[in-house]
Regions:
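Conserved acidic residues
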Residues: 45, 134, 161
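Conserved beta-strand elements of the Class I
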Residues: 21-22, 48, 81-83, 104, ...
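Zn-dependent metallo-beta-lactamase
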Residues: 1-16, 27-28, 74, 79, ...
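Short secondary-structure boundary segments
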Residues: 25, 51, 140, 166-168
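Active-site-proximal loop/helix segments of hydrolase catalytic cores
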Residues: 91-158
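Pre-active-site segment of Zn-dependent metallo-hydrolases
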Residues: 12-48, 52-72, 86-100, 118-129
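Metallo-beta-lactamase
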Residues: 58-109, 186-208
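Binuclear metal-ion centers of metallo-dependent hydrolases, dominated by the metallo-beta-lactamase
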Residues: 4, 97, 162-217
């Protein structure tokens, strides 16, 4: 499986058979230009949307005619099982920012979890609904989402083997959130990839948790 970071909370996940999934596509230039990542130029077969904010739900920015996945209904598309688990975008049961959906997908024998804009620690029931995750795509920037400490706890509770941080402060993002280094200081094993993508196979998953930091386009 190939994972490419498009910026913010958006990734392109591509299976060996060529099925393409894009998570949380953003509207470039939204929020008065605060979302300064390059416009998405990729196409997809499937698009997942964790919640309806402009930096996560710009489905029209994705090429092709993808099937759009919203909400917590379990489904299977192009041979890929997708489970949605309903959570919240804040610590007040959605009163501040509404609901958020975590998506669990199995691609090439790898269980991938995309946390969207998770705003709280996971309950035991939420963690049980997700089960163990091989590759975790997690926000780490805080303020609108969980921050470094909570992200570390969530990764540990899900038994994540590869942790790819997202939704953190970069030169392209004007939101008042924390940089990735605040999260990396808490983690023992960190690999910075020179480039926007990484390939991961089920046979090569690390025995100990490892953080993989990607560059954005």
């Amino acid at each position: 499986m190939k994972i490419k970071w498009l910026g913010h909370a958006s990734f392109l996940l591509e299976s060996k058979s060529g099925t393409k999934i894009i998570t949380d596509p953003f509207e470039a230039g939204s929020y008065d230009g605060a979302v300064g990542y390059a416009p998405i130029s990729e196409s997809a077969d499937i698009v997942t949307v964790s919640h309806d904010h402009a930096d996560h739900n710009a489905v029209d920015s994705v090429g092709g005619t993808p099937e759009v996945v919203r909400g917590s209904e379990d489904r299977q598309i192009d041979g890929i099982p997708i489970r949605g688990v309903s959570t919240f975008h804040d610590e007040s049961k959605g009163q501040d920012r509404g609901r958020n959906t975590i998506y669990l997908m199995e691609i090439d024998g790898i269980r991938v979890g995309h946390l969207g804009d998770l705003g709280h620690r996971l309950s035991d029931d939420e963690a049980a609904a997700l089960g163990k995750i091989d590759v975790l795509l997690t926000p780490v920037g805080g303020y609108y989402t969980i921050g470094p400490d909570e992200a570390k706890e969530v990764a540990e509770s899900l038994g994540a083997k590869v942790i790819i941080p997202m939704h953190f402060k970069t030169e392209a993002l004007g939101f008042p959130i924390q940089p990735v280094d605040d999260f990396l200081r808490l983690m023992e094993r960190v690999e910075r990839v020179e480039g926007t993508s990484v390939e991961i196979s089920a046979d090569d998953l690390p025995a100990e948790p490892k953080v993989v930091v990607l560059e954005y386009e």
